Amino acid sequence: VLFFNVDSDDWLHQDSLLQISTLSQQALAKADSAGIIALKSFADGSIIGNKFIHDGIFHTFRDLELLGQGGERSIVFRTAIASKFRFPLVSGEKFMPEGIVYDKYHDFSFLISNRSLTICEYQENGLSSNPKALMLRNPGCYKLYYRNRIDMAASIKERLGYILRYNFFAHTYKGTDVEDYRGAHSLLVRSMKALNCIVSRSYK
């Protein structure tokens, strides 16, 4: 059984369900496959972002990110796996970045397809129209996101970027739902708190 989440301002191509049915035969044949990742397009047919470098093979979310192939995608999940990874709740906040859940799929791969399954129409006043304001309204959610990413970093540069953002949102967040980072890089996290002013300027 598959699960396909479509945003309220998006719609499907006439043959999207048929395409999903066809792709699912290959996707579900692999035991550690969590579903399908395909493209999104605008109403004029132009693709959102870039086409995948590798079509018809399996990648994890992290693989795609490291290849520079992330971004807006149509994602079809295997329901049995998706049901294990729920969005956490942070009191008083309304937006949780999808990456918090996607990062939990590190042991699962997805069939990659260069077919567009979703037609997207961005709303002028939609959630993503002002990302900085959205993040500032949900500091606990972004504290959690960047906290989890610190140990995932593939390079020191990437890790430092996550730590800077984590420290900023940890300082901004006044709630108690999200615990502080206590991983292997705790000393580095603490030593970089003085750099909060640098990140603060970027959110003004």
Where are these regions (language model features)?
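Short beta-strand-to-loop acidic/aromatic patch adjacent to the donor-nucleotide binding site
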Residues: 1-11
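Alpha-helical elements of Rossmann-like donor-binding domains used by nucleotide-donor carbohydrate transfer enzymes
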Residues: 15, 19-22, 100, 104, ...
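Conserved donor NDP-sugar-binding/catalytic core segment of glycosyltransferases
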Residues: 15-50
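Conserved nucleotide-sugar donor-binding catalytic segment
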Residues: 43-132
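Catalytic core of nucleotide-sugar-dependent glycosyltransferases
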Residues: 117-123, 130-156
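Structural register within alpha-helical repeat arrays
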Residues: 163-166
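Membrane-interface aromatic/basic loop that binds lipid-linked glycans or pyrophosphate carriers
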Residues: 171-204
